[in-house]
A protein has these predicted regions:
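N-terminal glycine-rich dinucleotide-binding loop that anchors FAD/FMN and/or NAD(P) in oxidoreductases
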Residues: 27-53
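Helical element adjacent to the flavin cofactor pocket in flavoenzyme catalytic cores
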Residues: 174-235, 240-243
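Conserved flavin/dinucleotide-binding core of flavoenzymes
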Residues: 28, 86-89, 294, 307-427
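Glycine-centered tight beta-turn/hairpin loop motif at sheet-sheet or coil-to-beta transitions
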Residues: 33, 78-80, 235-237
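Mobile amphipathic helical/loop "lid" adjacent to a hydrophobic cofactor/ligand pocket
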Residues: 47-171, 175-176
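Hydrophobic anchor at the start of a short beta-strand
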Residues: 9-12, 64, 245
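Glycine-rich FAD pyrophosphate-binding loop
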Residues: 6-30
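Mid-domain catalytic core of redox enzymes
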Residues: 218-350
Length: 427
């Protein structure tokens, strides 16, 4: 939003952190070959589902490279050995050769094929926007093998949510997201890419022309509105008046900044819960599947009922890191990695798209511009980079009379705009 608005207007950015970028957070790891940049938040995108991000990268001349998006699950069984498989062909599925004789695994595979084939028709059923995913799967006759060993772990890995919350996920949102992202296709899945040198490279290009107008370490304490403008009080004690304010933060943080929020702002911005996730950048292989042949880009490490979601991202594979040191980003491990393996600990908050949140989400745009205040963030869509970008660009265009320097099909298809067609992705 600030990038596009500043092409015509005088824009000041208040950033709470000491670096710009938010979840575009590249950490430099010391490796035998030298310093290696590793992403820990935003990591990958694809051109099919991220049209504006793709266009932005091309406009800024950001160099990208192919990535790998394989998925594996390592599940607690109550026995000494875990149940493990990956989607990387037969050798991944049967990496543990005992899986060949596992009736549960064969049933899971058969039901994956059945669900993927039925998904387009299932998404047309009425009432699925209010039906929890767990209830939907049971009503459709899918077994615990499909639910507990594949779908729920994959959803938990994508949205960084515990299994209990994934089961309450609206079934329609799940079906549309998986279908639109090619996750229910047995072939023809989108090709994923990553920013060469880490996402810091695009953040640098996005901000380099605005030096002096980005105030780092200047979190906003309070925003107050009146008939003539907006008063912004920051954490450093500064107080300034502006014509308009764009609050580009999580919805709960946005609400916390408003010192004079009205009832509608409190209802809509307060409707979306957030999940705190602890991420560790480290080199401890104990947080990967036991079977080395199972190792994939995304590795769901199941710890049983009631455990927080634990996912390990194999960064060497995701970003083709130029090092022999194996580096991982693990969310919510049951214990901390060994200290000599730790590079960095980071805290991230992710939106939880429960039914109440989705109802509020469809009404969010009605508060745009009220009392000179605008909002944008990934919570307007699916919680991903493209969603935040679409919201920010749409706000800039509506507020500032500016236009993004590219044309893409269905440019705001992931967010709910007044008078727009049904969103391309609900979540």
């Amino acid at each position: 939003a600030a990038w596009l608005l500043s092409s015509r207007h005088h824009v000041t950015v208040f950033e709470k952190e000491t670096r710009p970028g938010g979840h575009s957070n590249t950490i430099v790891a010391d490796c035998p070959e030298g310093p290696v940049p590793v992403d820990t938040g935003f990591i990958v995108y694809n051109e099919r589902n991220y049209p504006n991000l793709t266009a932005l990268f091309r406009h800024l001349d950001v160099e990208t490279q192919a990535s790998n998006m394989s998925f594996a699950a390592s599940l607690e069984t109550g026995c000494k050995r875990r149940f493990e498989y990956s989607g990387s062909g037969l050798n991944g599925i049967f990496a543990d050769r005992r899986n060949i004789a596992s009736l549960r695994l064969w049933r899971m595979i058969g039901e994956i094929v059945r669900l993927y084939r039925a998904a387009p028709d299932l998404a047309l059923q009425t009432g699925l926007d209010e039906k929890p995913l767990g209830v939907f799967l049971r009503e459709q006759g899918y077994s615990a093998a499909l639910r507990d060993d594949h779908l729920l772990p994959m959803c938990a890995a994508i949205w960084s949510l515990p299994l209990e919350r994934v089961e309450q996920f609206p079934a329609l949102a799940f079906l549309r997201f998986f279908d639109n992202h090619g996750l229910m296709g047995l072939k023809g899945r989108p090709a994923w890419r990553t920013v060469k040198g880490g996402s810091r490279e695009y953040v640098r290009k996005l901000t380099e022309a605005r030096e002096g107008r980005i105030r780092l370490g200047a979190g906003v304490e309070t925003v107050r509105r009146d008939e003539t403008g907006v008063l912004v009080l920051d954490a450093r004690g500064g107080c300034e008046r502006f014509d308009h304010v764009v609050i580009a933060a999580h919805s709960d943080e946005a609400l916390g900044m408003l010192g004079d929020a009205d009832e509608t702002e409190r209802r809509l911005l307060g409707a979306m819960p957030y999940q705190r996730n602890i991420a560790w950048l480290h080199s401890d292989p104990a947080f990967m599947p036991d079977e080395r042949r199972v190792w994939s880009s995304w590795n769901y490490m199941g710890g049983g009922a009631g455990s927080p979601v634990c996912v390990s991202y194999w960064m060497n594979r995701l970003q083709a890191l130029p090092t022999e040191r194996q580096l991982f980003v693990t969310l919510n491990p049951s214990r901390e990695p060994e200290s000599d393996h730790v590079v960095k600990r980071i805290e991230y908050d992710h939106p939880v798209f429960d039914m109440g949140a989705l109802v509020a989400q469809r009404q969010l745009w009605q508060i745009q511009g009220t009392r000179r205040t605008w909002f944008c963030g990934a919570y307007f869509g699916s919680g991903f980079h493209e969603d935040g970008l679409q919201a920010g660009l749409a706000v800039a265009e509506q507020l500032g009379g500016v236009r993004r320097p590219w044309v893409v099909e269905n440019q705001s298809g992931r967010i709910s705009l007044p008078g727009s067609a049904v969103r391309e992705q609900v979540v």
